[in-house]
């Protein structure tokens, strides 16, 4: 038996396929989902979700949203998502560097808040890219 996993953003579907296992970056911590999991609704933070399909792990950077688990279906609705192998690592590193610079120099609360969010996003993208470049289980 498998899980049907969907990762959906406002403008596209990032993943829609049968999978064996999912690890979600819930706001309360990492959450593992296998077949037969109890129904669940949880908030998703900025981080990397991992999907095991055909015996291999896939990393997807996700940016805030919700996940629902019911009847061996996992639906992840997030603001943004990017598969690890499609991440532009140089652009993500540039975003991280710029956000760190703003945090070190700005005293404006709004700028600092946005920089913290950008840092989280960049770190998730970089982590997904690094995981996406690895093979195996």
Curated annotation (Swiss-Prot):
Compartments, as annotated in UniProt: Cellular thylakoid membrane
InterPro entries the UniProt entry points to: ATP_synth_F1_dsu/esu (IPR001469), ATP_synth_F1_dsu/esu_N (IPR020546), ATPsynth_dsu/esu_N (IPR036771)
Keywords, comma-separated and alphabetical: ATP synthesis, CF(1), Hydrogen ion transport, Ion transport, Membrane, Thylakoid, Transport
Entry-linked SUPFAM superfamilies: Epsilon subunit of F1F0-ATP synthase N-terminal domain
UniProt keyword Thylakoid present: yes
The keyword Ion transport is annotated on this UniProt entry: yes
Main subcellular localisation: membrane
GO CC, alphabetical: plasma membrane-derived thylakoid membrane; proton-transporting ATP synthase complex
An MF annotation (GO) of this entry: ATP binding
Family annotation (Pfam families): ATP-synt_DE_N
Membrane topology: Peripheral membrane protein
Family: Belongs to the ATPase epsilon chain family.
Assembly and binders: F-type ATPases have 2 components, CF(1) - the catalytic core - and CF(0) - the membrane proton channel. CF(1) has five subunits: alpha(3), beta(3), gamma(1), delta(1), epsilon(1). CF(0) has three main subunits: a, b and c.
Record's function text: Produces ATP from ADP in the presence of a proton gradient across the membrane.
UniProt protein name: ATP synthase epsilon chain
Species assigned in the record: Synechococcus sp. (strain JA-2-3B'a(2-13)) (Cyanobacteria bacterium Yellowstone B-Prime)
